[in-house]
């Protein structure tokens, strides 16, 4: 109870502010007056005084919303809006109107003119929400942009600008005059006003979409645009204008479920397909429990000593762990993971001869996304489909570090309280549970646990049949496509008509979800997270008990279970939820099966009979908490490593920006100073230098050197003057082309070295995870190693800048075009992160051999 007592105390404070907003009566004002009031606020608002304007701005947005789209935010929605404005997470149950809630903090913060980003999980929702709320923003004089995948961008505009402006001037309202109810049904809305305030999308450039006051888009596109902006060779080509304020919809899905999944911009590599085929054959020869074992709890594979010896014989090598065989180890581990940790129709499907990943959190297909580090190719080899070439990373960032760049970050979701600690620790965001507008009356039954999966599915079909016969709609949640299809076949056998909603049928999603609350409807769906569509009850369904939710398995996260449950009982509707489980379900079998089996044996449960008790439901919740804790630990590890990389990424990107802004002379000066200082450090002692060694080290510059002074200070001054003179001569030789050429060289040098550095960092992560078992802190080791490497990379950047600049003739148009074409070839990927997981490996010496633990 303490948790919610604290939440109630927090909510109490917001009610005082709600009362203040409610006292502002704007009904007598016409739309033109409301718009002018907001213009006046815009002229006076600053980051320092923004909170003073909350009551007035929220009241204006509420009144305008009522008049142009016919929706008036409830008092609890005002609380949600204040929570979002304060940079917190608002937990709002399904159907409580999150989309409308966001309009108030969006408008308030957009008045500062720095751009507000509204982040959604897919293109469909970005377009839908921007157009749905668009009339509010347009009426208030704000521009709305939408960014979509495939580089498409739009602006929300009036369908008929003349008609819309006329309606605003004449104070035409969707909300009928004198209507005092809380909610206006569609049939009661003023049709003339609805027609006047219609909007549409106009295609614009990406940069223009970001220049709008408000920009809607997906998490992946916001992240990729940031990475792409840091690969451009002209400042004008950048599209984003900063990271001021973001509201993330389905915030738990994006900031927690996807936190281990970095965004990667990559290009083709030179690995051969034949290597993957060869190691796929080797993996097939290995025998489980003889050559390797599987730890299902940690989803890891451990090679045995016998396995290592057998592999060494097959490969005809002496030591599998010799540095020269590192690449063989990568191929082998990926092949084993492909065979024993990744399942067809669960983790991926084969579609048109390609491996397409299935999102484990939402059940959606992720076309175009590929596992990194050669894993995707290993799965292609396993399934016998065409092996696509591996990719080289040009730029990468995790969602954790991308979203932490925003000055203010907030989020909304139906389920966040269970992850409150992670939101607080990683993002500094508190979670506030927003009260529902009407009391929630859904009945959540205790779990029913069966001995076998077969018994469980038979019971599920029996329950569906019973409810179908009385006309009650049923939504069944499954954990994989495979199980959806198994249940579908069983229902077809019983002649029960039903719809299937999973990654193979995503085109029909919105249509199917809309029908899921109708009388007699039966819908099977993989994870319902991120669906973004409310299920409204059809006529006569309330009387039958509302929508029944059946869960066929508990997920690793309680949140996903709660999201499934939350599909029923929206806005005070009746509803019911039951989970049917079995001892063969993964989470129970791996984490708690023995305890439950003992209980079932004690109470002598007959075949086909379930056991249910609140204690059992609690036991399963404890198991889920344990799994959540393990996953949180992995995400924290990833963040610690990526934060080291993030500091370096920001340093490189800010240096690129410095160069893009035209500071080429200063860059060359820095390069010369660094170049000289490093040589003096190496070849001078107590103020005296080894001149011959220095001459030898300067040969790379391709310049003739006369007699050099041998004292440190004199030599430093001599070399600085010499190189600066060469630099000035080169500038004169190239004339007005120099700024462009100098910038081009500097950027190419930085980008190529950064690309190589990212590749090397992958190997460092691998190596430090092994050191962890020599009682060394892997994070500390990673920091030490990467700081040294980063310093070496900067030295190379400065050295190469000097060499290329002093030896350049003239850049041709062809070279510039080639550079632009290279940029076009890069791909955007959102890959599973397979590196931090490697930290979980266990390595032990035994008879000169090592055991290696692989974690997915």
Swiss-Prot record:
Q: What InterPro entries does the record tag this protein with?
A: Helicase_ATP-bd (IPR014001), Helicase_C-like (IPR001650), P-loop_NTPase (IPR027417), SecA (IPR000185), SecA_CS (IPR020937), SecA_DEAD (IPR011115), SecA_motor_DEAD (IPR014018), SecA_preprotein_X-link_dom (IPR011130)
The reaction(s) catalysed by this protein are: ATP + H2O + cellular proteinSide 1 = ADP + phosphate + cellular proteinSide 2
Among Pfam families, the record links this protein to:
P-loop_SecA (PF21090), SecA_DEAD (PF07517), SecA_PP_bind (PF01043), SecA_SW (PF07516)
Task: Give the UniProt record's GO annotations in the biological process aspect.
Answer: intracellular protein transmembrane transport; protein import; protein targeting; protein transport by the Sec complex
Task: Cite the EC number.
Answer: 7.4.2.8
The UniProt record lists the keyword Transit peptide: no
Task: Kindly provide the name given to this protein in its UniProt entry.
Answer: Protein translocase subunit SecA
Gene label = secA
